[in-house]
Amino acid sequence: MSLALIGFLMVATFMTLIMTKRMTPLVALIVVPTLFALLAGFHAGLGDMMIDGLKKLAPTGVMLLFAILFFSTMTDTGLFDPLVGKLIRLVHGDPMRILIGSVVLCALVSLDGDGSTTYIITMAAMLPLYKRFDMNRLHLVCLLMVTSGVMNLTPWGGPTARAASALKLDPATLFVPLIPGMIAGLAFLILLAIHFGRKERRRIGKVELPAVLDAADLAVSQWPEARRPKLIWFNAVLVIALLVLLVWGVLPLPILMMLAFAIAMIANYPDTKSQKERIAAHAGNVLAVVGLIFAAGIFTGILSGTGMVEAMSKEVVGVIPPFLGPYMAPITALLSLPGTFFISNDAFYFGMLPILAEAGAHYGVEPMAIARASLMGQPVHLLSPLVPSTYLLVSLAGVDLADHQRFALVPAALCCLVMTVVGMLVLAFPFVG
């Protein structure tokens, strides 16, 4: 049995187990790759592969740990209560306005380039509205994920930087022609939000709000004793400073999150008893997310260490018949959907993209065009169980990963299609070389 086939079977088995809910993602991420690695004969060195995978995802795990603690602490202090209060008054109990607002807020927050931070902030602001009006949280999770996938194409976002690095291209030159496609993707999401809004209107109608709402009605924070209204401006400046430093890149993101959390704790809860209470209040959420991140390290470590990723990439490229060569740009866009879903962004852009670019060059398709086309699948990529921030998103929303994947797959794929068509229309990449 070829290594590529084993790799595809491993991913298919994993997806089947979690989508049929026969195994939790945490357990499947550990057990499935281990069994398939042993089946492929990689008894020696298996532990080293796992450790390598854990090392690569360790910074992400640390970042998420302290990001959840920091933004949860900010929520506890009441920092987001005024924002949610303003939103509640603006939407006037209309589910459609809430859904459209979710897309707009996520698009703005996504400019920081980090999906985890985006999810934490937008969830803190929007989830209370969905709970209050008993709206379907799968709508929220779908809209946030696909919006984040569209906004992920900014030059400081991971995929664009990877594609530029892999083919030695200028990120800014790579990015600018993609802007019309991104705008089209966001327009599609607004229409999707309107569609979801009509469904919610039929289901729950327009919620009548009291003429006068007290502070408790508008609060996101769950523990009144943890609120710090006198420190709201300090906390706001702290969050803004964190986001500025994040974009500026003066320190690694995990370090920034650790420092921000420590400062927030000292300023808002100076006594150790209060600090322990705040940490304990969010420990369950932290454990659920970080545990999945490290389990994903086992999966990606084995996928890379065994050489399955390279073998899978070559097999995918090898099935493209010569007569389709001139159409390498749209083919690359199409391949980016399953490609970035089944293997990590690193594996796709550093392993598969150079092969696709080389194949395209033989038919007159420039590497720049192939690179742009390869970014079209990002909304579907975020559905992948290999994406750490996806676990954070579903955990914060309290929805099942498999339910989210089934619900969001078609909208995400349609958004990719819209971006691809517009990308070809504005000549970001050609239909035919």
Where are the regions a protein language model picked out?
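Membrane-interfacial loop-to-helix junctions in multi-pass transporters
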Residues: 1-5, 55-61, 87-101, 132-140, ...
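Core transmembrane alpha-helical segments of multi-pass membrane transporters/permeases
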Residues: 27, 46-81, 107, 254-255, ...
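Hydrophobic mid-bilayer segments of alpha-helices in multi-pass membrane transport proteins
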Residues: 4-15, 22-41, 61-68, 232-243, ...
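Membrane-core helix-loop-helix motifs of multi-pass transport proteins
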Residues: 128-213, 220, 366, 376, ...
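Long, contiguous bundles of hydrophobic transmembrane helices that form the permeation core
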Residues: 1, 39, 176, 180-278, ...
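Re-entrant/interfacial helical elements at transmembrane boundaries that shape
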Residues: 82-85, 117-129, 157-169, 311-312, ...
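Hydrophobic alpha-helical transmembrane segments of multi-pass integral membrane proteins
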Residues: 63-66, 93-125, 319-358, 362-363, ...
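Transmembrane alpha-helix interface/packing and boundary motifs in multi-pass membrane proteins
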Residues: 14-22, 71, 105-114, 145-151, ...
